[in-house]
């Protein structure tokens, strides 16, 4: 059974952080974050796109329960999901940028393909 990375936070903080990162990804199309956060965000974002590809009311309500903005859910179901209708997974890409200046954390860009 796959486990989540802890990311140095308790479970409530981690879950809300991932929800916010997924919402930001669908709002802007790309986000810049650290590599472990990007890998966890990718897992959640790909699940949301697969859910949106179903397109039924139950899937929409599940997405609304996960994401923090209703307009982003509408965008996901009406614009993003139809674009990936014929693709089975692999909706996102991680591009590494190298270490961050302040703390040398590996930074990368997570974007929709």
UniProtKB/Swiss-Prot annotation:
Pfam family, one: Ribosomal_L17
BP terms from Gene Ontology: translation
Superkingdom of this protein's organism: Bacteria
Presence of the UniProt keyword Lipid biosynthesis in the record: no
GO cellular component: cytosolic large ribosomal subunit
GO MF annotations, alphabetized: structural constituent of ribosome
Matches recorded under InterPro entries: Ribosomal_bL17, Ribosomal_bL17_CS, Ribosomal_bL17_sf
Matching SUPFAM superfamilies: Prokaryotic ribosomal protein L17 (SSF64263)
Subunit structure: Part of the 50S ribosomal subunit. Contacts protein L32.
NCBIfam families hit by this protein: L17
Family the entry assigns: Belongs to the bacterial ribosomal protein bL17 family.
Name of the protein in its database record: Large ribosomal subunit protein bL17
